[in-house]
From Swiss-Prot:
Activated by the chemical integrated stress response (ISR) inhibitor ISRIB which stimulates guanine nucleotide exchange factor activity for both phosphorylated and unphosphorylated eIF2. Signal peptide: none annotated. The gene is EIF2B3. InterPro entries: eIF2B_gamma (IPR051960), NTP_transferase_dom (IPR005835), Nucleotide-diphossugar_trans (IPR029044). Keywords: Acetylation, Cytoplasm, Initiation factor, Phosphoprotein, Protein biosynthesis. Belongs to the eIF-2B gamma/epsilon subunits family. It comes from Bos taurus. The keyword Cytoplasm applies. This is Translation initiation factor eIF2B subunit gamma. The modification Phosphoserine is found at residue 261. One of its GO terms (molecular function) is guanyl-nucleotide exchange factor activity. GO terms for biological process: cytoplasmic translational initiation; oligodendrocyte development; T cell receptor signaling pathway; translational initiation. SUPFAM superfamilies: Nucleotide-diphospho-sugar transferases. The modification N-acetylmethionine is found at residue 1.
């Protein structure tokens, strides 16, 4: 096996707690499928026969119940409930299972990327790391319950690449930078022209050499792949031979002192050094690198920047809504055998359901009810003359006659009574909105009614 695939499904969704307080993030519905289904489906489509899923006991129960139809074997590993593990910690937790290079994905990645483009980059350059990034995009649609709420300032990443746009030369978050951007002279000697991007977003898909995982195992101070390991690997490129030799001498001293923190070069063996023969066919792709440069610089980092297609990380409430808006374009491509409207759904006025809407199994839609740009879950009841526009209704939601719902999320088992008018709201699980009530820009949860 060339790669072992690992899906990280541990994070609690700290930036969308209004949803994840009642539904674990990996199980949040997107297009009537659990969020974690998308990275698992991506792996299955490209031929993986087994994947390691690192998650919690709550998610494990759902995976065992709902994913038994997958051809791919799921090796589910639960972390202790009390553990506060980062992504690097999680890799260390399954270290004994990892025997080859590793492909790591986040459970919140939804993409139609041609995965081989990232993997081929990793292979062709014998890279230590190959990762996926996309151009950042802002949704113009309102976020339910967020109007007037101060938006968190997103910290940009400064990403430097070579003339091919593939070699990753510099990566740092602006929060970690001073007023000046300092580039090592050893990088500029080999790459005098560096192209910087500030509008790229990390998709959290990484190919990692096995020796990188070995390095992580011995360097327990690194807790995050994204914010600690990757910047470290990028910085370690183009280390001079003398500095490497000096490091080796230093490591001998460290071993004598039984200290555990070791440099990445301690874990790069001769077998990992690039040999020219297996890569003759793709050597033309290495235009920015010479054989001499590659052989000396054993740590090599590459990035595939996705310019077209769908690539979204569902890490905020706004991105969650946007994913549900976009998924009607993706599902017919990756699941052509499935209809957007389930065959068991009962719809009286079918012509009033938009072509870009999804309706789940056993849902009933009454006469003259309009559903546009929306996702409706399973076992919902939508009575007559209801209007649903640009919304997500989860499972077992009841909407009584004459109600109007716009740009909102209605969670499981909620009831919207007759004639209610709801706009830009998040209605929590099991909540009831009384008849003819008007709600605008609010979050309604357990013992909660927040006017934003």
């Amino acid at each position: 096996m060339e790669f072992q695939a690992v899906v990280m499904a541990v994070g609690g969704g700290s930036r969308m707690t209004d949803l994840t307080s009642s539904i674990p993030k990996p199980l949040l519905p997107v297009g009537n499928k659990p969020l974690i289904w998308y990275p698992l489906n991506l792996l299955e489509r490209v031929g993986f026969e087994e994947v390691i899923v690192i998650t919690t006991k709550d998610v494990q129960k759902a995976l065992c119940a709902d994913f038994n139809k997958m051809k791919m074997k799921l090796d589910i590993v639960c972390i202790p409930d009390e553990a506060d593990m980062g992504t690097a910690d999680s890799l260390r937790h399954i270290y004994q299972k990892l025997k080859t290079d590793v492909l790591v994905l986040s459970c919140d990645l939804i993409t139609d990327v041609a995965l081989h483009e990232v993997v081929d980059l990793f292979r062709a350059h014998d890279a230590s790391l190959a990762m996926l990034m996309r151009k950042g995009q802002e949704s113009l649609e309102p976020v339910p319950g967020q109007k007037g709420k101060k938006k968190a300032v997103e910290q940009r990443d400064f990403v430097g690449v070579d003339s091919t746009g593939k070699r990753l030369l510099f990566m740092a978050n602006e929060a970690d930078l001073d007023e000046e951007l300092i580039i090592k002279g050893s990088i500029l000697q080999k790459h005098p022209r560096i192209r910087f991007h500030t509008g790229l977003v990390d998709a959290h898909l990484y190919c990692l050499k096995k020796y990188v995982v070995d390095f992580l195992m011995e360097n327990k101070s690194i807790t995050s792949i994204r914010s600690e390991l990757i910047p470290y690997l990028v910085r370690k490129q183009f280390s001079s031979a003398s500095s490497q030799q000096g490091q080796e001498e230093k490591e001998e001293d460290l071993k004598k002192k039984e200290l555990k923190s070791l440099d990445i070069y301690s874990f790069i063996k001769e077998a990992n050094t690039l040999t020219l023969a297996p890569y003759d066919t793709c050597w033309n792709a290495c235009r920015g690198d010479s054989w001499e440069g590659l052989s000396r610089s054993q740590v090599r980092c590459y990035v595939h920047i996705m310019k077209e297609g769908l690539c979204s990380r569902v890490s905020t409430l706004g991105l969650y809504m946007e994913a549900n808006r976009q998924v009607s374009k993706l599902l017919p491509v990756i699941c052509p055998e499935e209809s957007l409207i389930h065959s068991s759904a009962q719809i009286v006025s079918k012509h009033m359901v938009g072509a870009d809407s999804l309706i789940g199994p056993d849902t009933q839609v009454g006469e003259k009810s309009s559903i546009k740009h929306s996702v409706i879950g399973s076992s919902c009841v939508i009575r007559d003359r209801v209007t649903v526009t640009n919304c997500l209704l989860m499972n077992s939601v009841t909407v009584e006659e004459g109600s109007n719902i716009q740009s909102s999320i209605i969670c499981n088992d909620a009831v919207i009574e007759k004639g209610a008018d709801i706009k830009n709201c998040l209605i929590g699980s099991g909540q009831r909105i009384e008849a003819k009530a008007k709600r605008v820009n609010v979050i309604v949860g357990n013992d909660q009614f927040l006017e934003i």
